[in-house]
Regions:
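Short active-site oxyanion
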Residues: 34-38, 72-74, 113-115
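Short, well-structured N-terminal submotif of metal-dependent ribonuclease cores
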Residues: 1-40, 53-66, 131-133
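Short amphipathic alpha-helical interaction patches enriched in hydrophobic/aromatic residues
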Residues: 12-15, 52, 72-73, 90-94
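A generic structural signal for short hydrophobic patches within well-formed alpha-helices
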Residues: 11, 45, 124-125
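Active-site neighborhoods of divalent-metal-dependent phosphate/nucleic-acid chemistry enzymes
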Residues: 75-117, 122
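General small-molecule cofactor/ligand-binding pocket signal
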Residues: 39, 76, 138-140
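Acidic, PIN/NYN-like endoribonuclease modules and their adjacent C-terminal/linker elements
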Residues: 1-3, 106, 110-141
Length: 141
């Protein structure tokens, strides 16, 4: 099975049982996480830690950090080439408010040839890539 990129919103939903997307995130993690199909970036890891710490407290953030040390999710580092590509993405989509994390995620997904994302961020539905922007990520829920 192809790998799935996991975005911040999915990690947060998994950590917060009160989140409206908790059950969806939990289901995907249970099925695909055991198969070793989940991938994220170091930028998403840090953004998620900060979000969980701000909303759920330091204890929950440490719990998330510990869980990320397992083999359930593979974390890839954003490279300088990814950063250059991310900047090009931000420039070529002036009508969209893609965050730095979104742009680096898109660049990393393209580099790793990942077509699927577990994301609740609408930007993953909007972004198109390929020679004529004919390709879209498939959102897994």
């Amino acid at each position: 099975m192809p790998a799935i990129f996991v975005d911040t919103g999915a990690f947060y939903a998994l950590a917060d049982i009160g989140d409206r997307n908790h059950s969806v995130a939990k289901s995907v993690f249970e099925v695909r996480g055991m198969a070793g199909d989940l991938v994220t970036s170091d930028y998403v890891f840090v953004e998620t830690w900060c979000l969980i710490r701000a909303r759920l407290g330091r204890g929950a953030a440490i719990q998330y950090w510990d869980a990320m040390q397992s083999d359930v999710v593979t974390t890839h580092g954003v490279t300088t080439k990814d950063l250059s590509q991310a900047r090009a993405i931000a420039s070529s989509w002036p009508d969209q408010d893609f965050s730095l994390i979104d742009c680096t995620s898109f660049a990393l997904m393209e580099r790793l040839r990942l077509d699927e994302a577990l994301a609740f961020d609408n930007h993953f539905r909007i972004y198109r890539y390929g020679l004529r922007r004919e390709r879209a990520f498939r959102i897994v829920h």
